[in-house]
Regions:
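Histone-fold recognition with a strong bias for associated Lys/Arg-rich disordered tails
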Residues: 1-172
Length: 172
């Protein structure tokens, strides 16, 4: 349900579709969306990865290798600008909506999508999480530091996270 997604989540899904088209894949799948989250300009996920001591661009590089191995579909019978959401990604997005609801949030934000990967990741992404030592508990801890007790009640919640850090001034 697109009305329940934040602007950054919609941006990430659109970027994932563009990436799938670029890689000549017929489906938008989990690696495409995680890549979009890791490379999102001014995105929350790269910020959280940094808090965890991880480099989102290096993780994105691993995802590029995964996407390069997804079968390509070319030829005259294919509409090059049409891609479909895979069943795996559809399940992940549905899980994201459930996570948002459980957290008392009104919109599905990028952190909900990221959290849904921990329980719904395909084998390639599980391996990337293992290789980079990314786990749900440390991610939740970093998220709590940035988000605090705020709830997602608008479609632009990422703008309000860590506001003191962005605009505050140390008076000491």
């Amino acid at each position: 349900n697109m009305q329940k997604l934040t602007k950054k989540t919609i941006e990430a899904i659109q970027a994932a579709q563009d990436t799938a088209i670029e890689y000549q894949n017929t489906n938008v799948d989990q690696p495409h969306l995680l890549y979009a989250l890791m490379t999102q300009e001014n995105g929350l996920i790269p910020q959280l990865m940094k808090k965890l001591g991880k480099d989102a661009t290096v993780i994105a590089g691993s995802l590029e290798r995964v996407m390069a191995n997804i079968p390509k579909v070319t030829g005259s019978g294919r509409d090059m600008n049409t891609v479909y959401i895979s069943q795996s990604l559809d399940r992940l997005l549905n899980a994201s909506e459930a996570i948002a609801k459980n957290m008392g949030d009104e919109f599905v934000s990028v952190e909900h999508v990221m959290l849904s990967y921990f329980d719904n990741a395909d084998k390639d992404i599980k391996q990337i999480f293992k290789d980079f030592a990314i786990d749900k508990d440390s991610f939740l801890k970093a998220l709590q530091e940035v988000r605090g007790n705020q709830r997602v009640t608008t479609d632009t919640p990422e703008d309000t996270y860590d506001v003191l850090k962005k605009y505050g001034q140390d008076l000491v």
